[in-house]
């Protein structure tokens, strides 16, 4: 269990360049039915920012 938590913590967060929303893989995103532990890279290309609707390509990595 500790190994899984450290893997999730190592995943990068991404910020929407349109509205500033931050996707945190450790938390996931309930509004889009994205479970905790889902890396940004694994989100489908059709995934949109839950705050403003921007496309996935409008996000930039943090950290």
From Swiss-Prot:
Q: How is the cofactor bound?
A: Binds 1 Fe(3+) ion per subunit.
Family annotation (Pfam families):
Rubredoxin
Residues binding Fe cation: 16, 19, 49, 52
A biological process from GO: alkane catabolic process
- What cofactor requirement does the entry state? Fe(3+)
Domain of life of the source: Archaea
**Occurrences of domain Rubredoxin-like (ranges):** 11-62
Single GO term (MF) = electron transfer activity
Q: Give a yes or no for keyword Hydrolase in this entry.
A: no
Q: Which InterPro entries match?
A: Rubredoxin, Rubredoxin-like_dom, Rubredoxin_dom, Rubredoxin_ET, Rubredoxin_Fe_BS
Gene3D superfamilies xrefs = 2.20.28.10
Q: Which UniProt keywords apply?
A: Electron transport, Iron, Metal-binding, Transport
Q: Please report which protein family the annotation says this sequence is part of.
A: Belongs to the rubredoxin family.
Known role:
Rubredoxin is a small nonheme, iron protein lacking acid-labile sulfide. Its single Fe, chelated to 4 Cys, functions as an electron acceptor and may also stabilize the conformation of the molecule.
Q: What is the name of this protein? A: Probable rubredoxin
